[in-house]
Regions:
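A solvent-exposed interaction/effector surface
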Residues: 1-210
Length: 210
């Protein structure tokens, strides 16, 4: 059986639909940074997703090539994730999608080194005829966070975030979103195949003691 991050790390990928506090360990990611409306057809966000998956699947299938990654084991490509923020806005203004800054990421297995990553970017660019130079090897250390499984459309997230904020207040914590610690979403559902009211999205916010 291929290693599945969602099953092996349920505490980070499959939380309940009520707020909980977690300490998220440091991990490495394929990342592409950008700005703009994620729903724009053929826009920067959709291009970034194409790059992420091109590199992710090149690494996943590397064992079928002459390139060998030390410590490799077969695995399921983890879910797409995103870090989101808007300049000069506290929290997230869901009505102004064109103002979004984002870092889209896919988690890497620990055995993927920077050297392996660089090989995958170069190989994906050649084989898929897609410029993958925007992809970067990014290490993220989230630390203490509050998270919840949001069910439904992205536009309905404010009500879920309000539950998270109330939970923090009751338990002596506050949000700690700043330039380095950001609103984080993990997309468990494939939005192309599942109705919006059934979308599952992990929402995670950095926190600190009040």
């Amino acid at each position: 059986m291929a290693f599945d991050f969602k099953k092996e790390y349920k505490e980070f990928y499959m939380p309940k639909n009520k707020p909980e506090i977690v300490d998220v360990p440091k991990a490495n990611y394929i990342a592409v940074r950008g700005k703009g409306n994620p729903n724009e057809e053929g826009g920067a966000y959709q291009q970034a997703i194409s790059v992420l998956y091109a590199v992710a699947y090149t690494l996943k299938m590397s064992y079928k090539t002459d390139y060998k990654i030390e410590g490799f084991f077969e695995y399921v490509v983890p879910p797409l994730e995103g870090f989101w923020w808007q300049d000069n806005v506290e929290g997230v203004d869901y009505t102004n999608k064109s103002a979004f800054n984002w870092i889209s990421v896919i988690r890497l297995p620990d055995f993927v080194s920077k050297e392996n990553f660089d090989w995958a970017v170069e190989t994906a660019t050649k084989k898929k005829k897609l410029d993958c130079s925007s992809a970067e090897y990014l290490t993220i250390d989230e630390g203490m966070c509050v998270q919840i499984m949001h069910l439904g459309s992205f536009d309905d997230e404010p009500a879920t975030v309000a539950l998270m904020d109330a939970y923090l207040e009751q338990n002596g914590y506050v949000n700690d979103m700043n330039g380095k610690r950001l609103h984080h979403e993990i997309y468990i559902s494939d939005a192309r195949k599942v109705a919006p009211e059934k979308w599952k999205t992990v929402i995670r916010h950095p926190i600190k003691k009040a």
